[in-house]
Amino acid sequence: MKAISSWHVGVSAEAYAAAIFARYGYDVSVQYGANQPEYDLIATSGDLMLKISVKGSQDGSWGLTQGYKKGCDYHTATAKWLAAHHKKTIFCLVQFKDTAPNEMPRIYLASPVEIAERLNASAGGRGETILYENHTWGPRAAGSGTTDRIPDEWMISAERLAYMFSTYGQ
């Protein structure tokens, strides 16, 4: 399938995220309008609420910390990115790469701290601004021969959702 615009990726990612939370039985509220600060969705379970920032991608990666990189190393950029995000906001990472329009994308849930740990470990520990779903570094790269991969436990599931609500629910 040909690539779609970043706007279509974002709208699709938010719609899939809202749908999957609802499908698991959570109440979902969607923010509409210009980019809202910090989060795109709110999901509730009883008295617990999660603020959810949705990030969509169609290339196997999510660029997250580039805006913090100017004049510093990857680890400092990641620390700045982490400081800018509330620790109770979770990320819903939606990946459309290698999916047909009528197929579900892969969906992952992670906290800012979990993402920062992956970014810092990326490229053999050098760090990176991009979170990769599954990327092996080539022979000329800083992390030559290493593979960055989203942990399997981040894949959305009833267990992952229960963990997120019990750990990060407000």
Where are these regions (language model features)?
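Mixed-charge (Asp/Glu-Lys/Arg
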Residues: M1-P37, I42-Q170
